């Protein structure tokens, strides 16, 4: 059985707490992930949100988008609203051939209410 390894960018910077690696450039994250032997990386806050920008950036470091995270707030929004909001990310993931998306309900968490 073959295994493909991917990593999350939280190993370099934390989207929820920017004081933890917020000054680390995306290019450093991608370079070091590639140098460490990973072929995939999750999306993160520093990643371009348009496929025409993201795909060349990933290709530059010989990486693929392997997954990513979507934080839904189903306490405040309806499921129909969340389905509308996630569409841009789904298109990006489809364009990048990402095999999965992590759907998380963030109500009451630092992601859903950082204050």
Could you say what each language-model-derived stretch is?
Residues 1-100:
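N-terminal pre-domain/capping segments
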Residues 93-115:
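Active-site groove signature of glycoside hydrolases
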């Amino acid at each position: 059985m073959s295994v493909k390894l991917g990593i999350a960018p939280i190993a370099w910077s934390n989207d929820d707490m920017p004081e933890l690696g917020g000054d680390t450039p995306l290019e450093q994250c991608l370079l070091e992930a590639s140098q460490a032997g990973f072929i995939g990386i999750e999306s993160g806050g520093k990643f371009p949100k348009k496929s025409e920008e993201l795909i060349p950036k990933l290709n530059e470091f010989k990486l693929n988008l392997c997954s990513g995270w979507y934080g839904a707030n189903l306490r405040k929004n309806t499921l129909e609203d969340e389905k509308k909001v996630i569409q841009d990310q789904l298109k990006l993931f489809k364009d990048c051939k990402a095999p999965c998306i992590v759907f998380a309900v963030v109500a009451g968490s630092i992601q859903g209410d950082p204050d």
